[in-house]
C-alpha cells in the first residue's frame, strides 16, 4: 500500500490556478469513479474548497505521476501545466499533512474549524461512492479523532481572528451575556452579515439592521430575525441600541455626535457600546468622548486579532506535537495490522478448505443413502477435530518446551468468552466472505 496526497492550496497556487482544478460535488463523484475504473487508485477521497483541492488515494503499483497526468486530463489542461503548483506527500508524511489540514493548521486562518466539516463531507461522499474501504476508513476515523484532540487539548480555536467574530467577542466581554441586549448594525454587507450571525449564535436579545437599501436589510432580518430600517430612521431607533456595530461604505460618518447625545438622554445615560469597523469611519470619533459611550475602531480590533493570532501560533506548536504522535501511532497500528492480516487470511483459508473437504464427503454419503443425522454429527465432529488439531498440537509442544509466552498468548486468543464470540460472529462471517 502507498498512501498519496496530491493537491494545490492557497500557499502554493493563486486563485486563477486553484479554480482550474476545483471540483463541484457532481464532478467529485464522477472523478472518484474514474480513478477507480481506470485502476489509478484502490481508494480515494477528493477534498475541494475555495482554498484547496486535494486528492487522497491508496495505490498498489501505480505511480503518482499517473495521478498527476489524470488530473491534467480531467480538467483538459495542457500537459504538466500546473505541476509547479502541485504538492505531493506519501505515507506517514501524507498522514501528517491530512491531520494538519483537518486540525486547521494548514488553513488560511490558522485554526479555523470549518475545514473539518468540509473534510467529513468529502469523506462521506467518497464512502457513498464506494471509493473508501478498510485503509482510508481507518485513517479518516483516526484523523477526525486527532482533529478533535487538537481542538480540545490546545487553544488553537479559542481566540477570534476575524473582525466580525472579534467585534462580537468584545461585546460579550463588555456585557457578559447578550440575551437582554439590543444590537444595531449599520450596513448589510458580508461583514455585517457575519456579525449578525455571530450575534444570533450568542443569543442576542434584539437585532436591528439599518441600511441605505432597505431590501438588503430585510433579506438579512428574514433569515436572522430582528427588523430592518433605513439609514434615515436611525435617529428614531438609536436609543434602543445597547450595542452599535457599523460597517457601511459611506464616505462620511453615519452617526453624528448630536444623534448620540440625543440617544443617551433618552436612555437616561445608560451606556452604549460601539464598534466602528468601517473605513472611512461611520461613527464620528468625538462620540467616544461621552462618558457613557465606549467606542472602538477597526484598529482596536486589529490589535486583538494580532494578539489572538500570536496565541494561536503558540497553540499550533502544541498541535504539531499531537499530530506527530498520532501519525506515528496510526502508522504503527497499520503496519501491525498488515503483518497479522496474511496470517489471518491463511488461517481462514485452511479452515475453509477443511470445511469444503468435510462437506463434500458428507454430501457424497448423503447421496448414497446415508443417515442425515449421523452424517451431521460426523461432519460436526470432523470439523471440530481438524480445526483444533494444529493449534492444540502446537500448544502441547509449547508446554513441553516451557514456552510461557506462547501459552499465555494462546489462552488470550483461544479462550474467548462465549458472549464475545457471539457478539463478533456476524463480523467473522462478513470477513470470511469478503
Swiss-Prot record:
- Please report a single Pfam family linked to this protein: GlutR_dimer
Residues annotated for substrate binding in this entry: 49-52, 107, 112-114, 118
InterPro entries membership: 4pyrrol_synth_GluRdtase, 4pyrrol_synth_GluRdtase_dimer, 4pyrrol_synth_GluRdtase_N, GluRdtase_dimer_dom_sf, GluRdtase_N_sf, NAD(P)-bd_dom_sf, Shikm_DH/Glu-tRNA_Rdtase
Q: Where are the transmembrane segments?
A: none
Keywords of the record, alphabetical order, are: NADP, Oxidoreductase, Porphyrin biosynthesis
GO annotations under biological process?
A: protoporphyrinogen IX biosynthetic process from glutamate
Per the UniProt record, the site (Important for activity) maps to 97
**What pathway is this protein a component of?**
Porphyrin-containing compound metabolism; protoporphyrin-IX biosynthesis; 5-aminolevulinate from L-glutamyl-tRNA(Glu): step 1/2
EC annotation? 1.2.1.70
Q: Which residues form the active site?
A: 50 (nucleophile)
Disulfide topology:
none
Enumerate the catalysed reactions: (S)-4-amino-5-oxopentanoate + tRNA(Glu) + NADP(+) = L-glutamyl-tRNA(Glu) + NADPH + H(+)
Provide the binding site for NADP(+). 187-192
What is stated as this protein's family in its record?
Belongs to the glutamyl-tRNA reductase family.
User: What quaternary arrangement does the UniProt entry report?
Assistant: Homodimer.
Q: What does this protein do?
A: Catalyzes the NADPH-dependent reduction of glutamyl-tRNA(Glu) to glutamate 1-semialdehyde (GSA).
Domain commentary = Possesses an unusual extended V-shaped dimeric structure with each monomer consisting of three distinct domains arranged along a curved 'spinal' alpha-helix. The N-terminal catalytic domain specifically recognizes the glutamate moiety of the substrate. The second domain is the NADPH-binding domain, and the third C-terminal domain is responsible for dimerization.
NCBIfam families hit by this protein: hemA (TIGR01035)
**What more does the record tell us?**
During catalysis, the active site Cys acts as a nucleophile attacking the alpha-carbonyl group of tRNA-bound glutamate with the formation of a thioester intermediate between enzyme and glutamate, and the concomitant release of tRNA(Glu). The thioester intermediate is finally reduced by direct hydride transfer from NADPH, to form the product GSA.
Q: What is this protein called?
A: Glutamyl-tRNA reductase
Q: Which organism is it from?
A: Hydrogenovibrio crunogenus (strain DSM 25203 / XCL-2) (Thiomicrospira crunogena)
Q: Which gene encodes it?
A: hemA
